[in-house]
Amino acid sequence: MKVKDILGSNPLNKRHRGPHRKPRYRGRDLHEGGAMAGVGAIHISEIEPTLRKLEKELGLNLRDFTLGSVGKKEFSGDIDIAINLKPEELADFGKKLQAAPSTQEVKKSSVFMTSVPIVGYDENKTRDGLTRTGYVQIDFMPGDPGWMKTYYHAPHEKDSKYKGVFRNIMIASIAGRIDVVVGDEKIEDGRPLVQERWIWSPTDGLIRIKREPKPRKDGNGYTKAKVDTPISNPIRDPDGIAKQLGLTSGKDLYSFETLLSALKKSYKGEKIKQILDDFRSNYAVQDIGVPDEIS
C-alpha cells in the first residue's frame, strides 16, 4: 500500500517516482530514491521461498513482518516489510543489505529498496497485462512492526473488492467528522483560528490535534498551510481505534465493506452523508473510482 494514496497528502511517500534506469544485475550500489528497474510481480507461491532465502542472508525474520496485501492475493507488485530498527542502526542495515548475495541495486529514501531474484520463478504463472521479470522489488520500512501491520493492513482479495487504501481513507473520513470543536474566531479566508479534531496518522495512529493556520513569517496574516499540535495520546490498537470512532470493535476496521456496514449501524442521516462525501472527494478515490456501494 502506498501511503501517499491514503489520506490525499504525502506524509511518507512510498510510491517512489524517479528516473527509470537500465536494469543493473551486477554490483550492489546504494543510491538515493527512485523505483527499482527491471522488476515485476511475484506470485503468491513464490513469496515464501524468496523471503526464506533472503532471511538466511540477512539473519532477520522477514516473513512475519510483511505488510499490506502481500500473501493475500495471487500476485503482488512488490513486497513491503517492516523492520524494527533504531535510527542509529539503519546505516549498518543498509550495508548488510548491500552485502547480501541476492540483492541487486539498493536505493534509500524513507525506506530501503532493492530487487531480488524470485526463487522458484515460474514464467507460466501470469495473467494479461501483468509484468513478470523474475525479479521483485522489496521495500524495507523502518518503524514499529505491530503498528505498521495495523496501518498498512489490507483485506484478503476474497473478502473485499477494494484495496487497503480505501479502508484507510474511510477511517480518516470518519475521524475527520467526529467530535470536531471549532472556535468562533475566523481569519480572513474563512478558516477558523483554532479547531480541535481527530486525525488518522500513518505514524501516530488515531490522535486528537489542535489545528491552527500557519502564520506568515513577516507576521502579516497566515499562509494556506496548517499547524497540527497533538493534544492526546495516540490510539493504535484496533479495538481502541474503533471505540473512539464510535464503532463496535477492531473487526470493523478489516475492510472498506466492514467499515461501511459499521458506519451505517453507528451513525445516521447527515453525519453519514458528510463522512461519505469526504470519502468520495478524496483524490485517490477519484483516481481509482468510487466504490459501487456508495456511487
Feature names for model-found ranges:
Residues E57-L67, G94-S115, V180-D189:
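Short secondary-structure junctions
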Residues K53-E57, L85, V106-M113, N282, ...:
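Intrinsically disordered, low-complexity eukaryotic regions enriched in glycine, serine
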Residues M1-N13:
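Short acidic, low-complexity intrinsically disordered linear motifs used
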Residues T126-I294:
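Catalytic cores of NTP-dependent nucleotidyl/adenyl transfer enzymes across multiple folds
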Residues N10-L67:
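Helical scaffold of the NTase/Pol beta-like nucleotidyltransferase catalytic core
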Residues L51-A91:
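Active-site nucleotide-donor binding segment shared across nucleotidyl transfer reactions
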Residues Q98-M148:
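Conserved catalytic core of two-metal-ion nucleotidyltransferases
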Residues A41-L51, A91-L97, S160-I171:
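Well-ordered, non-membrane alpha-helical segments in soluble/globular domains
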